[in-house]
Amino acid sequence: MAPDPKLPSADLPSQKQVIELLDGEFARAGYEIDDVVVNAATRPARITIVADGDKGLDLDAVAMLSRLASGLLDTVDTGDTPYVLEVTSPGVDRPLTTEKHFRRARGRKAELSLADGSSLTARLGGTDGDQVNVVVAQGKDFAVRQIPLREITKAVVQVEFSPPNRRELELAEQTGKGARA
């Protein structure tokens, strides 16, 4: 019986092994590993590391983390199994599910679904323990609302194509270049 190509190759490290190998070094660099996918079904096999940090993940950070991961993974015996290493950010479509996700998305606009069945679009402000401050439109102005994280059933960052309103950013405890007055 042929091996299942969806399962990691015996020569590739497991998800757990990759996390154990890289977690400490990523943390020292100021980043966390959100997920690792080891996929032997692709040709060549692929190891994808999803990382994030409080300052986000720009191209320089991705390059640095890729070099770091590559160097550490080179110490693992993968036999003759070639693989592609990919280091990436979680992406804008990742649901916000933890306090740190909300903290890292501060200043971004998000679509929120609440436990009472209502939904709203708001700019995310700071977190305070078990709640998040959000900025919502109120007529021609903006208001700050505090929402307990347990009341948020779904939250997804929205892509914006124009600069945010300066007042809205100020209320979200943000300053931003290019914000319109």
UniProtKB/Swiss-Prot annotation:
InterPro entries: Ribosome_maturation_RimP, RimP_C, RimP_C_sf, RimP_N, RimP_N_sf. Its main location: cytoplasm. It comes from the Bacteria. It is found in: Cytoplasm. Keywords: Cytoplasm, Ribosome biogenesis. Pfam families: DUF150_C (PF17384), RimP_N (PF02576). Coiled coil: none annotated. Belongs to the RimP family. Required for maturation of 30S ribosomal subunits. NCBIfam families: PRK00092.2-2. This is Ribosome maturation factor RimP. The gene is rimP.
